[in-house]
Protein backbone atom coordinates (compact mmCIF):
# COMPACT_ATOMS: atom_id res chain seq x y z
CA UNK A 1 0.00 0.00 0.00
CA UNK A 2 1.01 3.65 -0.39
CA UNK A 3 1.47 5.40 2.96
CA UNK A 4 1.99 9.11 3.59
CA UNK A 5 3.27 10.04 7.07
CA UNK A 6 2.80 13.65 8.20
CA UNK A 7 4.74 14.89 11.24
CA UNK A 8 6.34 18.17 12.28
CA UNK A 9 9.65 16.30 12.69
CA UNK A 10 11.24 13.93 10.23
CA UNK A 11 14.30 12.43 11.90
CA UNK A 12 15.85 12.28 15.37
CA UNK A 13 14.09 15.20 17.06
CA UNK A 14 11.21 14.33 19.40
CA UNK A 15 8.47 12.43 17.55
CA UNK A 16 10.73 12.26 14.50
CA UNK A 17 12.26 9.16 16.10
CA UNK A 18 8.86 7.46 15.90
CA UNK A 19 8.29 8.73 12.37
CA UNK A 20 11.63 7.23 11.33
CA UNK A 21 10.73 3.88 12.88
CA UNK A 22 7.34 3.95 11.12
CA UNK A 23 9.01 4.71 7.81
CA UNK A 24 11.61 1.95 8.14
CA UNK A 25 9.15 -0.70 9.27
CA UNK A 26 6.56 -0.01 6.59
CA UNK A 27 9.28 0.10 3.91
CA UNK A 28 10.60 -3.25 5.14
CA UNK A 29 7.10 -4.66 4.68
CA UNK A 30 7.13 -3.67 1.03
CA UNK A 31 4.94 -0.58 1.28
CA UNK A 32 5.60 2.63 -0.65
CA UNK A 33 6.17 5.28 2.02
CA UNK A 34 6.67 9.04 1.97
CA UNK A 35 7.15 11.46 4.87
CA UNK A 36 6.01 15.09 4.78
CA UNK A 37 7.58 17.13 7.56
CA UNK A 38 8.34 20.73 8.47
CA UNK A 39 11.96 20.71 7.34
CA UNK A 40 13.48 23.34 9.61
CA UNK A 41 15.07 23.26 13.09
CA UNK A 42 16.44 19.75 12.61
CA UNK A 43 19.27 18.12 10.63
CA UNK A 44 18.83 17.87 6.87
CA UNK A 45 17.46 14.50 5.74
CA UNK A 46 19.12 13.23 2.57
CA UNK A 47 16.34 10.88 1.52
CA UNK A 48 14.05 11.58 -1.46
CA UNK A 49 11.16 9.90 0.39
CA UNK A 50 11.26 12.74 2.96
CA UNK A 51 9.53 15.86 1.67
CA UNK A 52 9.85 19.19 3.58
CA UNK A 53 6.68 21.24 3.17
CA UNK A 54 7.57 24.45 5.02
CA UNK A 55 9.94 26.99 3.51
CA UNK A 56 12.81 28.40 5.54
CA UNK A 57 10.95 31.60 6.43
CA UNK A 58 7.30 30.56 6.66
CA UNK A 59 7.44 28.73 10.02
CA UNK A 60 9.01 31.77 11.70
CA UNK A 61 6.61 34.23 10.06
CA UNK A 62 3.66 32.02 10.92
CA UNK A 63 4.82 31.72 14.51
CA UNK A 64 4.99 35.50 14.88
CA UNK A 65 1.55 35.92 13.32
CA UNK A 66 0.17 33.27 15.68
CA UNK A 67 1.66 35.06 18.68
CA UNK A 68 0.13 38.38 17.64
CA UNK A 69 -3.27 37.25 16.35
CA UNK A 70 -3.85 34.12 18.42
CA UNK A 71 -4.82 32.13 15.33
CA UNK A 72 -2.66 29.06 15.85
CA UNK A 73 -2.89 26.77 12.85
CA UNK A 74 -4.24 29.48 10.52
CA UNK A 75 -1.02 31.22 9.45
CA UNK A 76 0.66 28.69 7.14
CA UNK A 77 -1.14 28.82 3.77
CA UNK A 78 1.87 28.04 1.59
CA UNK A 79 3.01 24.96 3.51
CA UNK A 80 -0.58 23.71 3.71
CA UNK A 81 -0.97 24.16 -0.05
CA UNK A 82 2.27 22.25 -0.69
CA UNK A 83 1.14 19.43 1.58
CA UNK A 84 -2.26 19.18 -0.10
CA UNK A 85 -0.69 19.21 -3.56
CA UNK A 86 1.80 16.52 -2.60
CA UNK A 87 -0.99 14.39 -1.12
CA UNK A 88 -2.95 14.70 -4.35
CA UNK A 89 0.05 13.77 -6.49
CA UNK A 90 1.16 10.81 -4.34
CA UNK A 91 -2.45 9.69 -3.76
CA UNK A 92 -1.77 7.47 -0.73
CA UNK A 93 -3.95 4.58 0.39
CA UNK A 94 -3.31 5.66 3.99
CA UNK A 95 -2.47 9.05 5.47
CA UNK A 96 -0.73 8.66 8.84
CA UNK A 97 -1.00 11.82 10.95
CA UNK A 98 1.36 12.28 13.90
CA UNK A 99 2.14 15.77 15.29
CA UNK A 100 0.35 18.53 13.36
CA UNK A 101 1.27 21.57 15.47
CA UNK A 102 4.65 23.28 15.62
CA UNK A 103 3.95 26.28 13.38
CA UNK A 104 4.13 24.49 10.03
CA UNK A 105 0.65 23.77 8.58
CA UNK A 106 -3.00 24.75 9.01
CA UNK A 107 -3.96 21.38 10.44
CA UNK A 108 -7.73 21.87 10.43
CA UNK A 109 -7.59 22.85 6.76
CA UNK A 110 -5.58 19.75 5.86
CA UNK A 111 -7.87 17.43 7.84
CA UNK A 112 -10.90 18.98 6.14
CA UNK A 113 -9.24 18.31 2.77
CA UNK A 114 -8.65 14.66 3.73
CA UNK A 115 -12.27 14.37 4.87
CA UNK A 116 -13.75 15.98 1.76
CA UNK A 117 -11.69 13.75 -0.55
CA UNK A 118 -12.40 10.51 1.34
CA UNK A 119 -8.83 9.59 2.24
CA UNK A 120 -8.27 6.78 4.74
CA UNK A 121 -6.58 8.36 7.77
CA UNK A 122 -4.93 7.10 10.95
CA UNK A 123 -4.31 9.91 13.44
CA UNK A 124 -1.86 8.86 16.16
CA UNK A 125 -2.33 11.01 19.25
CA UNK A 126 1.17 11.54 20.64
CA UNK A 127 -0.25 14.37 22.74
CA UNK A 128 -3.75 15.82 23.30
CA UNK A 129 -3.87 18.22 20.35
CA UNK A 130 -6.36 16.12 18.36
CA UNK A 131 -9.19 16.77 20.84
CA UNK A 132 -8.16 20.15 22.27
CA UNK A 133 -8.59 23.65 20.87
CA UNK A 134 -5.13 25.21 20.49
CA UNK A 135 -3.33 23.25 23.19
CA UNK A 136 -1.34 20.01 22.91
CA UNK A 137 -1.71 19.37 26.66
CA UNK A 138 -4.69 19.96 28.92
CA UNK A 139 -2.91 20.23 32.30
CA UNK A 140 -5.74 21.06 34.74
CA UNK A 141 -8.16 22.35 32.07
CA UNK A 142 -11.19 20.18 31.31
CA UNK A 143 -12.76 22.24 28.53
CA UNK A 144 -12.02 19.39 26.13
CA UNK A 145 -14.95 17.54 27.73
CA UNK A 146 -17.51 20.08 26.57
CA UNK A 147 -15.64 22.09 23.93
CA UNK A 148 -13.39 25.13 24.21
CA UNK A 149 -15.47 28.24 24.81
CA UNK A 150 -12.74 30.74 25.69
CA UNK A 151 -10.99 31.70 28.88
CA UNK A 152 -8.07 29.43 27.98
CA UNK A 153 -5.75 29.08 31.01
CA UNK A 154 -2.85 28.27 28.66
CA UNK A 155 -3.23 31.31 26.37
CA UNK A 156 0.26 32.61 27.18
CA UNK A 157 1.89 29.20 26.81
CA UNK A 158 2.80 27.17 23.74
CA UNK A 159 1.35 27.66 21.22
CA UNK A 160 1.00 31.06 22.79
CA UNK A 161 -0.93 34.23 21.99
CA UNK A 162 0.18 37.54 23.46
CA UNK A 163 -3.15 39.33 23.16
CA UNK A 164 -6.13 37.22 22.05
CA UNK A 165 -7.76 34.00 23.21
CA UNK A 166 -8.78 32.21 20.00
CA UNK A 167 -9.16 28.75 21.55
CA UNK A 168 -12.90 28.63 20.82
CA UNK A 169 -12.39 29.60 17.17
CA UNK A 170 -9.68 26.97 16.73
CA UNK A 171 -11.84 24.32 18.41
CA UNK A 172 -14.76 25.15 16.11
CA UNK A 173 -12.49 24.87 13.05
CA UNK A 174 -11.41 21.41 14.18
CA UNK A 175 -15.03 20.40 14.78
CA UNK A 176 -15.95 21.37 11.22
CA UNK A 177 -12.93 19.49 9.86
CA UNK A 178 -13.86 16.28 11.71
CA UNK A 179 -17.59 16.49 11.00
CA UNK A 180 -18.80 13.49 9.04
CA UNK A 181 -15.30 11.99 8.68
CA UNK A 182 -16.10 8.32 8.07
CA UNK A 183 -12.68 6.92 7.25
CA UNK A 184 -10.53 7.97 10.21
CA UNK A 185 -9.16 6.01 13.16
CA UNK A 186 -7.53 7.67 16.17
CA UNK A 187 -4.85 5.78 18.10
CA UNK A 188 -2.88 6.56 21.23
CA UNK A 189 -1.66 5.30 24.61
CA UNK A 190 -4.20 4.38 27.26
CA UNK A 191 -4.38 7.67 29.13
CA UNK A 192 -4.92 9.67 25.94
CA UNK A 193 -7.46 7.21 24.54
CA UNK A 194 -9.54 7.44 27.71
CA UNK A 195 -9.67 11.23 27.51
CA UNK A 196 -10.23 11.27 23.74
CA UNK A 197 -13.29 9.04 24.10
CA UNK A 198 -14.74 11.47 26.64
CA UNK A 199 -13.90 14.58 24.62
CA UNK A 200 -16.55 16.60 22.82
CA UNK A 201 -14.53 16.65 19.59
CA UNK A 202 -13.86 12.93 19.24
CA UNK A 203 -16.76 11.32 21.08
CA UNK A 204 -18.19 8.60 18.87
CA UNK A 205 -15.16 8.21 16.61
CA UNK A 206 -13.18 4.98 16.22
CA UNK A 207 -10.45 5.32 18.88
CA UNK A 208 -8.02 2.48 19.59
CA UNK A 209 -5.30 2.02 22.19
CA UNK A 210 -1.79 1.72 20.76
CA UNK A 211 1.49 2.29 22.58
CA UNK A 212 4.35 4.31 21.12
CA UNK A 213 7.35 2.36 19.75
CA UNK A 214 11.03 2.56 20.63
CA UNK A 215 14.10 1.28 18.78
CA UNK A 216 15.56 -1.23 21.21
CA UNK A 217 17.58 -3.33 18.77
CA UNK A 218 20.17 -0.79 17.68
CA UNK A 219 20.11 1.77 20.47
CA UNK A 220 18.15 1.36 23.68
CA UNK A 221 19.44 -1.78 25.37
CA UNK A 222 21.61 -2.57 28.43
CA UNK A 223 25.29 -1.83 27.91
CA UNK A 224 28.65 -1.40 29.61
CA UNK A 225 28.90 2.06 31.21
CA UNK A 226 32.09 1.92 33.28
CA UNK A 227 33.86 4.41 31.00
CA UNK A 228 31.03 6.92 31.43
CA UNK A 229 30.95 6.35 35.18
CA UNK A 230 34.69 7.02 35.35
CA UNK A 231 34.41 10.14 33.20
CA UNK A 232 31.74 11.54 35.54
CA UNK A 233 33.83 10.64 38.65
CA UNK A 234 31.04 8.59 40.22
CA UNK A 235 32.32 6.38 43.06
CA UNK A 236 31.83 2.64 42.60
CA UNK A 237 29.80 2.43 45.82
CA UNK A 238 27.26 5.07 44.76
CA UNK A 239 23.79 4.42 43.41
CA UNK A 240 23.14 6.54 40.33
CA UNK A 241 19.82 8.35 39.88
CA UNK A 242 19.25 9.67 36.35
CA UNK A 243 16.75 11.97 34.71
CA UNK A 244 16.57 13.19 31.11
CA UNK A 245 14.57 16.40 30.80
CA UNK A 246 14.79 19.89 29.35
CA UNK A 247 15.31 22.02 32.44
CA UNK A 248 14.11 25.19 30.70
CA UNK A 249 10.72 23.59 29.97
CA UNK A 250 8.59 23.71 33.17
CA UNK A 251 6.32 20.98 31.78
CA UNK A 252 9.21 18.50 32.03
CA UNK A 253 9.43 18.99 35.80
CA UNK A 254 13.22 19.03 36.15
CA UNK A 255 13.01 21.29 39.20
CA UNK A 256 11.35 18.49 41.19
CA UNK A 257 14.23 16.12 40.46
CA UNK A 258 16.59 18.70 41.95
CA UNK A 259 14.31 19.21 44.95
CA UNK A 260 14.41 15.47 45.64
CA UNK A 261 18.20 15.54 45.32
CA UNK A 262 18.34 18.40 47.81
CA UNK A 263 16.29 16.44 50.34
CA UNK A 264 18.79 13.59 50.02
CA UNK A 265 21.92 15.75 50.19
CA UNK A 266 23.11 14.01 53.37
CA UNK A 267 22.79 10.50 51.95
CA UNK A 268 26.37 9.75 50.99
CA UNK A 269 25.82 6.83 48.61
CA UNK A 270 23.85 8.70 45.90
CA UNK A 271 24.87 10.54 42.74
CA UNK A 272 22.20 12.34 40.71
CA UNK A 273 22.74 12.85 36.97
CA UNK A 274 20.58 15.46 35.21
CA UNK A 275 20.79 15.15 31.41
CA UNK A 276 19.30 18.08 29.51
CA UNK A 277 20.24 20.80 31.97
CA UNK A 278 20.09 23.79 29.62
CA UNK A 279 19.87 26.85 31.90
CA UNK A 280 22.68 29.14 33.03
CA UNK A 281 22.06 28.90 36.77
CA UNK A 282 24.52 26.35 38.16
CA UNK A 283 23.49 23.55 40.49
CA UNK A 284 25.41 23.88 43.74
CA UNK A 285 24.56 20.47 45.20
CA UNK A 286 27.84 18.51 45.25
CA UNK A 287 26.22 15.14 44.51
CA UNK A 288 24.43 16.35 41.34
CA UNK A 289 26.08 16.09 37.92
CA UNK A 290 24.52 18.22 35.19
CA UNK A 291 24.86 17.38 31.51
CA UNK A 292 23.63 19.63 28.67
CA UNK A 293 21.37 18.44 25.87
CA UNK A 294 22.60 15.18 24.33
CA UNK A 295 21.79 14.81 20.63
CA UNK A 296 23.51 11.45 20.10
CA UNK A 297 21.08 8.61 20.75
CA UNK A 298 23.98 6.27 21.48
CA UNK A 299 25.31 8.60 24.16
CA UNK A 300 21.82 9.10 25.55
CA UNK A 301 21.42 5.33 25.88
CA UNK A 302 24.62 5.22 27.93
CA UNK A 303 23.14 7.68 30.42
CA UNK A 304 19.95 5.64 30.65
CA UNK A 305 21.94 2.46 31.27
CA UNK A 306 24.13 4.24 33.84
CA UNK A 307 21.23 4.66 36.24
CA UNK A 308 20.21 2.36 39.04
CA UNK A 309 16.94 4.28 38.86
CA UNK A 310 15.45 6.59 36.23
CA UNK A 311 13.24 9.41 37.55
CA UNK A 312 10.50 11.13 35.52
CA UNK A 313 8.80 14.16 37.08
CA UNK A 314 7.04 15.34 33.92
CA UNK A 315 3.72 17.12 34.40
CA UNK A 316 2.06 16.51 31.05
CA UNK A 317 3.57 13.70 28.96
CA UNK A 318 1.00 11.38 27.45
CA UNK A 319 3.53 8.57 27.00
CA UNK A 320 7.01 9.70 28.11
CA UNK A 321 9.44 8.09 25.68
CA UNK A 322 12.32 8.77 28.06
CA UNK A 323 10.78 6.26 30.46
CA UNK A 324 10.37 3.61 27.76
CA UNK A 325 13.92 4.19 26.53
CA UNK A 326 15.29 3.94 30.07
CA UNK A 327 13.42 0.67 30.62
CA UNK A 328 14.85 -0.62 27.37
CA UNK A 329 18.32 0.18 28.68
CA UNK A 330 17.56 -1.95 31.72
CA UNK A 331 16.79 0.77 34.27
CA UNK A 332 13.70 0.71 36.54
CA UNK A 333 11.53 3.79 36.91
CA UNK A 334 10.24 6.20 39.53
CA UNK A 335 8.40 9.48 39.30
CA UNK A 336 5.08 11.26 39.55
CA UNK A 337 1.81 9.46 38.83
CA UNK A 338 0.86 12.27 36.44
CA UNK A 339 -0.80 12.17 32.99
CA UNK A 340 0.37 9.16 31.00
CA UNK A 341 3.50 8.40 33.03
CA UNK A 342 2.02 5.67 35.31
CA UNK A 343 0.72 3.83 32.23
CA UNK A 344 4.28 3.11 31.08
CA UNK A 345 5.01 0.14 33.34
CA UNK A 346 3.48 -1.85 36.23
CA UNK A 347 4.75 -1.86 39.79
CA UNK A 348 7.25 -4.64 39.10
CA UNK A 349 9.31 -2.16 37.09
CA UNK A 350 8.22 1.27 38.33
CA UNK A 351 7.17 3.17 41.44
CA UNK A 352 5.10 6.33 41.09
CA UNK A 353 4.17 8.81 43.80
CA UNK A 354 1.57 11.51 44.09
CA UNK A 355 2.45 14.50 41.92
CA UNK A 356 4.55 17.16 43.72
CA UNK A 357 5.09 14.86 46.74
CA UNK A 358 8.84 15.38 46.89
CA UNK A 359 9.37 13.64 50.27
CA UNK A 360 7.63 10.50 48.95
CA UNK A 361 9.72 10.58 45.79
CA UNK A 362 12.88 11.07 47.84
CA UNK A 363 11.96 8.04 49.93
CA UNK A 364 11.59 5.90 46.79
CA UNK A 365 14.99 7.09 45.58
CA UNK A 366 16.67 6.52 48.94
CA UNK A 367 15.37 2.96 49.22
CA UNK A 368 16.15 1.86 45.67
CA UNK A 369 18.79 -0.89 45.51
CA UNK A 370 21.76 -0.99 43.18
CA UNK A 371 20.70 -2.51 39.88
CA UNK A 372 21.57 -6.17 39.38
CA UNK A 373 22.09 -7.79 35.96
CA UNK A 374 18.91 -9.79 36.53
CA UNK A 375 16.94 -6.62 37.29
CA UNK A 376 18.33 -4.92 34.22
CA UNK A 377 17.43 -7.87 31.98
CA UNK A 378 13.88 -8.01 33.35
CA UNK A 379 13.29 -4.31 32.65
CA UNK A 380 14.64 -4.67 29.12
CA UNK A 381 12.52 -7.74 28.38
CA UNK A 382 9.35 -6.02 29.55
CA UNK A 383 10.06 -2.96 27.42
CA UNK A 384 10.80 -4.99 24.29
CA UNK A 385 7.75 -7.19 24.70
CA UNK A 386 5.44 -4.20 24.91
CA UNK A 387 7.06 -1.34 22.98
CA UNK A 388 9.26 -2.84 20.25
CA UNK A 389 8.61 -1.34 16.84
CA UNK A 390 7.68 -4.66 15.26
CA UNK A 391 5.04 -5.19 17.97
CA UNK A 392 3.48 -1.74 17.63
CA UNK A 393 3.66 -1.44 13.85
CA UNK A 394 2.21 -4.90 13.25
CA UNK A 395 -0.88 -3.66 15.10
CA UNK A 396 -0.79 -0.39 13.16
CA UNK A 397 -0.58 -2.27 9.85
CA UNK A 398 -3.76 -4.16 10.76
CA UNK A 399 -5.49 -0.84 11.42
CA UNK A 400 -4.42 0.35 7.96
CA UNK A 401 -5.84 -2.80 6.39
CA UNK A 402 -9.15 -2.34 8.21
CA UNK A 403 -9.37 1.24 6.93
CA UNK A 404 -8.73 0.19 3.34
CA UNK A 405 -11.44 -2.46 3.59
CA UNK A 406 -14.06 0.13 4.61
How would you label these PLM feature ranges?
Residues 373-386, 395-398:
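A short, well-ordered alpha-helix in the C-terminal region of glycosyltransferases
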Residues 130, 145-225:
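Donor nucleotide-sugar binding/catalytic pocket of nucleotide-sugar-dependent glycosyltransferases
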Residues 332-335:
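Short hydrophobic beta-strand element within catalytic cores of glycosyltransferases
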Residues 302-307:
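Short alpha-helical donor nucleotide-sugar binding micro-motif in glycosyltransferases
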Residues 347-358, 366-371:
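Conserved acidic donor-binding segment of nucleotide-sugar-dependent glycosyltransferases
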Residues 276-301:
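Nucleotide-activated donor-binding/catalytic signature segment of Leloir-type glycosyltransferases, i.e.
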Residues 214, 235-252, 258-261:
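Conserved donor-binding/catalytic core segment of Leloir-type glycosyltransferases
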Residues 315:
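Aromatic "clamp/platform" in nucleotide-sugar-dependent glycosyltransferases that forms part
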Amino acid sequence: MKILIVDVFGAVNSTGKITTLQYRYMKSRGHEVRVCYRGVREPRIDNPDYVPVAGKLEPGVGRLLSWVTGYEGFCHPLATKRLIQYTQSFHPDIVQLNILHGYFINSHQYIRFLNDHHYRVCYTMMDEYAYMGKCPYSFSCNQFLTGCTGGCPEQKHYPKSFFFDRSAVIWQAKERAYRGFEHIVFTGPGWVVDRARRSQLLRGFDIRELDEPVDFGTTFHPREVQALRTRLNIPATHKVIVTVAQMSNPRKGGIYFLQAAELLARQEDLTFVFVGYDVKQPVTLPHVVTVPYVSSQEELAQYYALGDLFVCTSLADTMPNVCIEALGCGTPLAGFAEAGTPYVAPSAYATFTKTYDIPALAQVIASTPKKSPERSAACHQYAVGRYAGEVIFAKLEKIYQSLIQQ
